[in-house]
Amino acid sequence: MSTRDLPHSFSELSYGWVKRIRAEFTVGKSKEQLLAEDYHSTTDEDSEVVTSVKANSLWPAFASGAGLFSDGYVNNSISTVLFCLKKIYPDEITKSNAINNIASIAFVGTVVGQLGFGYISDRIARKGGMMAANVMLIFFTLMCAVGSWGVTVQGFFACLTVWRFFLGVAIGAEYPTSSVIASEFANQLPPGKRNRYFSWFTNAMIDSGFVVSAFVPFVLIWIFTEKHLRALWRVAIGLGVIPPLSLFFMRLKMKNSSSFQKLHMKNVKYRDYPWWLIVKFYWFRLTIVSLIWFIYDFSAYSFGNFNTIIIGEIIPEAPIWKQWGWSIVFNLFYIPGAFLGAISADYIGPRLTLALGVGIQGVIGIAMSACLNSLKKHIAGFVVVFGIFTTFGEFGPGDNIGLLASKTSATAIRGQYYGIAAAIGKIGAFVGTWVFPAIQSKYANNANPDLQLQVPFYISSALCLFSACLAIFFCPQVGQDAIYKEDHDFVQYLSNNGFDINMLGEGGDVREVCRESDSLEKGKRDDFQVDNNSL
């Protein structure tokens, strides 16, 4: 089983992915077919067959996933903070690395939060980890807004850097807790609807946070004017407290998912924890998912550079409010991709949607780089092409990389699996923040000034095409019933390799899981029929 995801022949590598498509496509399948297939995949004899999306089924997935709105808002608000600090302290900024430290320390904190809370989510408390992340997000956002002071300017920078680190930890903590919980509750929705709601409640929330974080400073600049930037940046980031504070009370009413209650490893002692079995079972697919996430975040940095190019061409030396107005326009391009990519993931599967989106994005990126000089002369066309390009980024990896991470892992280790993949992605973003400026500086004095942006974009676009190939040829199939199947396969693997599965969950639940899964494989429920009147 340690090589279960590896292609075992050239023909399997070349054509095996075609066979996997059938399990992922829902196009042309009736609701009855989807329900029947899902029933044959469920591991709980007493579980209710859900035939429609209801509000009481949606709110747990929303309450857990919507916390990522705050992550998008607070994370993106730092760009407003840095912009204001450069205006307020121009001399001090040039004499220190304060701005770089404030920007970079967030990556470190986020990685710490993703890895640390991934472990907490699986081994200590999944809901408890989410609540702790929620409280941290509220507190450290508030500290960044009102608790950042210093006797000297450099002391103020140091204070803000410290709070920014812990805010990064809180942001990172949301990924392996709230996203994982959202995926488990979304899995309780009817087949054919699960992927879209997970993506809407996670990635679309992050993108909405980006848009709002661009809009709020635009409004505040009219209220405070450019003479009061100190108040502006503190209010802008402080408003990020409101969403997690409101969600906190919704989350208090939540319970862990039924699958986590049955399959968690909280009761397994450290010395008995099957570390090596888990590594052998998941090493390959985790490597592929993490690599795709690394490339996506790594490339996103260079793609963002085009914002500066377009703004500089349209409104050179423009006032702050105009620059921030255009930032709203660019951030709005995320929304269509996030909305449509989620729907596509339910029809053709997250794996193929990711490959399609990132592949088209790579092609458009290469074309934009090749035609950069002429595009700069037609700004309206440039904005439209760039918008389409950005939309496909969210349509593909933006919506589906988290979906892949959550559906290619078993419930018992999903927090750690998701946290590791997300952390490697964030490391990719950090590497991009250092690599691409170095590449740009190398071509700064070149006879062809366009190379300064073309070369990084060629590199990123090529990596996009590479990640599309990884998704098509090496990612496992991810159907509507992927979580059910993965839980069964993982428990069966542990049992076959000598691990006492009675330590999973709350005792006897796991025996029921195995018994029901085995009976499904033997076809004991082939006589199941869906009552058409209930559909």
Curated annotation (Swiss-Prot):
Lineage, top ranks: Eukaryota, Fungi, Dikarya, Ascomycota, Saccharomycotina
This protein's record includes keyword Transmembrane: yes
Coiled-coil portions: none
One GO MF term attached to the UniProt entry: glycerophosphodiester transmembrane transporter activity
The encoding gene: GIT3
Subcellular localization(s) per the UniProt record: Cell membrane
Pfam family, one: Sugar_tr
Inducing factors: Expression is positively regulated by the transcription factor PHO4.
Function according to Swiss-Prot or TrEMBL: Glycerophosphodiester transporter that mediates uptake of glycerophosphocholine (GroPCho) with GIT4. GIT3 acts as the major GroPCho permease. Does not possess detectable glycerophosphoinositol (GroPIns) transport activity. The expanded ability to utilize GroPIns and GroPCho results from the organism's pathogenic nature and its need to occupy a variety of environments within its host organism. This possibility is buttressed by the fact that GroPIns and GroPCho are present and abundant in human fluids.
Protein family per UniProt: Belongs to the major facilitator superfamily. Sugar transporter (TC 2.A.1.1) family.
Recorded superkingdom: Eukaryota
Catalytic activity: sn-glycerol 3-phosphocholine(out) = sn-glycerol 3-phosphocholine(in)
Keyword presence, ATP-binding: no
InterPro entries: MFS_dom, MFS_sugar_transport-like, MFS_trans_sf
Protein name: Major glycerophosphoinositol permease GIT3
